Amino acid sequence: MSLIKKLPDIVANKISAGEVVQRPASAVKELLENAIDAGADEITLAIKAAGKTLIQVIDNGCGLSEEDATLCFERFATSKISDVGDLENLHTLGFRGEALASIASVSQVELKTKRYDDRTGTLVKISGGRFEEVSRTETPNGTAFSIRNLFYNVPARRKFLKTNATEYKHIFETVQAQTLVYPDIKWRFYSDDEEIFSFLNNNLSERLDYFFGKDFSQNLIEFTEENDFMKLRGYLGKPAMMKRTKNQQFLFINNRVTQSKLLSSAIMTAYGELLGEREYPFFLIYMDIAPHYIDVNVHPTKMEVKFDDERNIYNMVHSVVKHRIKTLDFSPNVQVEEKPDSPRPTGESFNFPGVAKRLSYNDRDADMRSSNALFRDYKTYYKAQDERAEPGFFANPKREMDWRSSLPAHTEASLTPPKQAEPEGNPTFHDGSRQMEIFIQSRDDEPATAGQERFVWQLHNTYILTQIKSGLLIIDQHVAHERILYERAIAVMESNVPNSQQLLFPHSAKLSAWEFDVLKEIKTDLVQLGFSLRILDQRTVLVEGIPPDVMPGREERILHEMLEQYQDYQQNLKLEQRDNVAKSYACRSSIMAGQKLSRNEMTSLIDQLFATSMPYVCPHGRPIIIKLSIEELDKMFGRS
């Protein structure tokens, strides 16, 4: 008896669905592409529960006959190609005939369709790959395709779906890309019975401004280039529009939403030194190329392509982009609103000295002992240097100090905010002409000493070098501050005592639809962190208060970046929600590499770093401190 058996179609389709339909957004993509291939110029998408309970696409395309309405659910049934040679002259988005069979096998499907010349339409109902009804029905011209309860019969697959906010973001990005590549189509998008957007005219600028912010399109550089076998057109972002993620990069090849490492590399290389560390440019590029020069049949989702002549394709894209960014004015267009400046926070009510909540670190006690020893090395060295300093060079009065009060605490301390300090006592971080309130406490019993001022340096406005008894410490200022803010955020949220700096002039922030969903998901933690937020409508939130670590005037930017960072961490790191919020906040609110600090700011940063429970690594695991001992330095210089 043979051990190898041919799988029934219904089983094969369920297995195939795991590759073709990875999440609700995959099903949305397939239905939208079918509507586009049908010649529709009006498409409506409606979802519920981020596509988990309902995905519905309605179009005014050519419709299907009764025979085709049932045949389209058969595996490898397609109207797009008839033999393999047709792939070299492909002008449609779909061609394999796999998607509908896969979708129908893992959901409950209802299809209503009618051709223009037919008197009545066709109704098809399928559940788990089995036909339940095929009948004639009254329906408008075009097609209405509904998918309910995706993966209802594949529990193992359904449990791996992400939160509604995450799945919604993927759907939003899918339909967003289609609206940009097909501006001539009228698009409507509804989520849980609320209209998200409605684009009823052929205006690409309107869509760009909706998705990315007011007047966004005015800061783009338009270009068009053409040669014998390819045409390039599109828009490039100015350096002032750089992002920390790649979610504002769009590449459309023959009107197909595509990802290409080759072309992305060509564009990034063309920007060259205009890009900072971990910065990505906006681009929206349309490539029209003869189908036989590309292969779109290389990935289950058809998101990747291969080129027949990669070198020439790369060189042309790189050359076009580089030429445009070298010859045009890249200064951003800025519109200034005349309104009173927001007040600057004063005092230190946001500091919580001595707080050391139990965080999930391995061997924490050993790390704390090591941290204490290194901190004692740093402090005792400066105390000894100060005692040996010649009198008269620094006129600061000397007082007896208790260095132990600066060591990391091992017990949970009170979260009562400390007494307000005089405003002039607050050190500040300088960022060009702007000043940010420092987040680091300067205790009255620990003034800067002569030794401290002499032995703290900033290297390339990125690293802090400080001399200790046993050698040299090198500290990354960004991740050091990130560690401080992370532990402070965790402590504040766990204390249930929000510490908010109220704004004299509240600021309204416009959110994208997915940002608004993320905001609703984490709003409680944001309030605990110190944000005072009032929702005005489904796209607008009023920021009335901010954590004291956020400079007034940057609240909207920080909020946008936090929501983006939170979503990125949620997808890639699978963090617990409160931990994710704290890490996103710390990452986006901390001082950056390249920011100049004063000596007082640097010594204060070091003091607070050593007051954390884990001063050696940032919340993401990057090293904060590198120590070079005298012995290691001696070896480098060949000293015996």
Curated annotation (Swiss-Prot):
UniProt keyword Cell membrane, yes or no: no
Pfam families given in the database record: DNA_mis_repair, HATPase_c_3, MutL_C
Highest taxon, organism lineage: Bacteria
Region feature (Disordered): 332-353, 408-431
Annotated GO MF terms: ATP binding; ATP hydrolysis activity; ATP-dependent DNA damage sensor activity; mismatched DNA binding
GO biological process, one term: mismatch repair
Entry keyword Transport: no
GO CC, one annotated term: mismatch repair complex
InterPro entries the UniProt entry points to: DNA_mismatch_repair_CS, DNA_mismatch_repair_MutL, DNA_mismatch_S5_2-like, HATPase_C_sf, MutL/Mlh/PMS, MutL/Mlh/Pms-like, MutL_C, MutL_C_dimsub
Keywords for the protein's UniProt record, in alphabetical order: DNA damage, DNA repair
Membership in a protein family: Belongs to the DNA mismatch repair MutL/HexB family.
PANTHER family named in the record: DNA MISMATCH REPAIR PROTEIN MLH, PMS, MUTL (PTHR10073), DNA MISMATCH REPAIR PROTEIN MLH1 (PTHR10073:SF12)
Role summary: This protein is involved in the repair of mismatches in DNA. It is required for dam-dependent methyl-directed DNA mismatch repair. May act as a 'molecular matchmaker', a protein that promotes the formation of a stable complex between two or more DNA-binding proteins in an ATP-dependent manner without itself being part of a final effector complex.
Name of the protein described by the UniProt record: DNA mismatch repair protein MutL
Biological source species: Chloroherpeton thalassium (strain ATCC 35110 / GB-78)
Gene that encodes the chain: mutL
